[in-house]
Amino acid sequence: MYGILVLEDGTIIRGKGFGAEAEVLGELVFNTSMTGYVEILTDPSYNGQIVTMTYPLEGNYGVDKRWFESEGIKAEGFIVKDMTGIELDSFLKEYGVPGISDVDTRFITKKIRSKGVVKSLLKTSATEISEEEEKELVNKVRNYEDISDIDLVPEVSTKKVVKYPAKDEKISCVVIDCGVKQSILNCLLERGCSVVKVPYDTKEEEILSYNPDFVLVSNGPGDPEKMLETANTVKNLFGKLPVTGICLGHQIITIALGGKTYKLKFGHRGGNQPVKDSSTGKVYITSQNHGFATDMSNVPEGSILSHVNLNDDTVEGISKIMDSDNVKGVVWSVQHHPEAGPGPHDAMFLFDDMVALGMKFKQEKTSKR
């Protein structure tokens, strides 16, 4: 099968198509992880994006549904240097997603690093694509709207409330689902925290009706400025119970606190990002997947810059205490992914911190009855 990648600047890259015979548009990004292609493809945060893997060999250990981060592939397309085995090909085919191999992924990555993320089109076809069609494809890419203008979260958020009971329940939390990864839910459940997953547009009254011990605002795709409704809900929750966030959830909390976000040139996507904990001085290697960040010059007043990225000094975490006398006033969030999926487990202890925070709040509630 033939494959072609078309960029908005007119660059055309030809290769071998695999997966589904299809044509997709999306923002072109790269991921530096050496493993985890199944987790990456099924991560809802990649909705609207065509993913280039910098590691050259993909597909060489098969596909297993136990690795899924959602119910199916969420990335628009997949770009690799070498594709091995039939399982990855069949996987993409099953979900109608095209892939392209036998291309210079180093060239693509360097282009993204120098020019920034770009609009792109990936097409696979049983017949060779003519030069005339190439011109039409370039026009399609140029007329495609910017990902910042697309509201991507509604496409990946749950449409109904879903409850996940922990085997040995200690506490419970509400996860505001902006595209939550299964690994995040698993990390909570493994620690005895039952989860109520709610749609991204759920109001604070309903969230509080579940009597959670804390709220987690999840990861997800797209521009956080599109999530002002969710940010307003989160703002209304401040001071009523502990609020935490991961990735997009961190950015939403930033906005809810009165801060601002901005788009990174090419984002952080991979499992090798060093992050410094400002309070301890310790450095963790983290998994990341985001194209936006908190504006460091506009960190919300009274907030603590808790974590910093050592590669580019971007904000990796903030915290704020609304009420020094009560744990219900605690707000904290991180930009990186402590659950990994894929990546290092250096920051996994943050889920222990979440559960400990929830336990403390639960004890406070009980003592006041």
Swiss-Prot record:
Its EC number is 6.3.5.5. Pfam families: CPSase_sm_chain, GATase. Residues 1-168 are annotated as: CPSase. This is Carbamoyl phosphate synthase small chain. GO terms for molecular function: ATP binding; carbamoyl-phosphate synthase (glutamine-hydrolyzing) activity; glutaminase activity. It comes from Methanococcus vannielii (strain ATCC 35089 / DSM 1224 / JCM 13029 / OCM 148 / SB). Small subunit of the glutamine-dependent carbamoyl phosphate synthetase (CPSase). CPSase catalyzes the formation of carbamoyl phosphate from the ammonia moiety of glutamine, carbonate, and phosphate donated by ATP, constituting the first step of 2 biosynthetic pathways, one leading to arginine and/or urea and the other to pyrimidine nucleotides. The small subunit (glutamine amidotransferase) binds and cleaves glutamine to supply the large subunit with the substrate ammonia. Residues 172-364 form the Glutamine amidotransferase type-1 domain. The keyword Transmembrane helix does not apply. The active site is at 247 (nucleophile), 337, 339. SMART domains: CPSase_sm_chain. It catalyses: hydrogencarbonate + L-glutamine + 2 ATP + H2O = carbamoyl phosphate + L-glutamate + 2 ADP + phosphate + 2 H(+). PANTHER family: CARBAMOYL-PHOSPHATE SYNTHASE SMALL CHAIN (PTHR43418:SF7), MULTIFUNCTIONAL TRYPTOPHAN BIOSYNTHESIS PROTEIN-RELATED (PTHR43418).
